Structure formats: structure tokens, C-alpha cells
Amino acid sequence: DYGPDKRLYITLNQTYTHAILLNCPIVPTISVPPERVLGLAFEPIPYLRLSYDFIHFAEKHVGLYYIGHIHPNLTGAFFKEHHGFMWHVPHPQIPPTLEEKYYKSDANQRNKISIIVSNKMKAPGNAYRHKLATFILINNLPIDIWGNGTEMYSKRFPNHKNIKGLFKDSEPYESYTLSICIENYRHPHYFSEKITNCLVYNAT
């Protein structure tokens, strides 16, 4: 039921009947009534950066905006404390089973657990992941570390086999039976692609 002549069709031009706002801290131009406008957040409040201009705009032009956590400044009844939207890595046609991962993985891969660290340190979860990565490397735990945050560890722990470095897509999930997920912030009704990526590849 999707297509230019069907009930549902996503258009790039100015002819549309409904609108979906993803995060959208910048005030958009909407030409449909508020009951046809839906907002979906996929970032926690500290990352959304919703301006007062957007909040005033949303009060008049947005029917519902699903957000993970309602900040005290978000007094409009259209803001709903509920998980909004989250993307994930492209999923395989047939997700590998845990048995396949455990018994048929690359013979060169000795570890079955992964963790991803970025080069960011600002959020509580960022800092905690770096503390955990340091502990893993100091104690030589059987956990592989991925992400752009591994560069600092490559200098401190040269030639450490657990440091895998950058990844393109699904490498930290597809051949692992477990992956450590730590969110940047703790908020009701919020979780990120850190969890959905693991679920897609059965790395729970």
C-alpha cells in the first residue's frame, strides 16, 4: 500500500498531507494542520537542543511529539513521555543464531564479547565506557574494543589484540554473542541504537 498513487508515500516536494519531524530542533515550515504533524525524538534531552522558538512553534503546529523524557520546560500537552524512534544498522536477511556465532565464528577471533567506545568524554556514559575499556585492557579481559575512541588506547596499549579500532557497519555485533551497551544518559523511555544494533544481530 505504498507508492505515488497509494495511501502512503513519502515525498520530497511541498505537496503532502502529513508530516513527521525527526528530532527537528530547527523550526521547519509546515503547511498541514497540527493533527497531521507527528514529532519523534531519537536523542535524549541533552542532545535534542530544542530551542524556545521550536517549542513555541510546536505548541501551534505539532499534534504529538513523542520524547523519551519530558523536561520541566516542555509543558505542552502534546509532548508525550514515550520512546520515539531509533535507527539501527542494516539487518541481515537471516540473523545468525548464538550457536552459529559460538561454534562457527572466525577461528582467529578468540573473544565473544564486544564493546564500542567513541572519542567523546562529555556524557556520563561516555566517561564510564572509557573507564571500563581501560579496566578491560589493564586486566586483559576477553572483550574486544571497537570505535574511534580506541585510538588513545592504541598508544597506551600498543599491539594489544583486544583493540579492534574503527568499524564500518556491523563488525562489533555480527560475530559476537554478547555486546556491552552503556547509554550516554539515563532517561525514562529512552534507549539508543546501541541496543537495537545488538538485537538486530542477536548479540544480547
Language-model regions: role of each:
Residues 1-204:
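Nucleotide-sugar donor-binding catalytic core of glycosyltransferases
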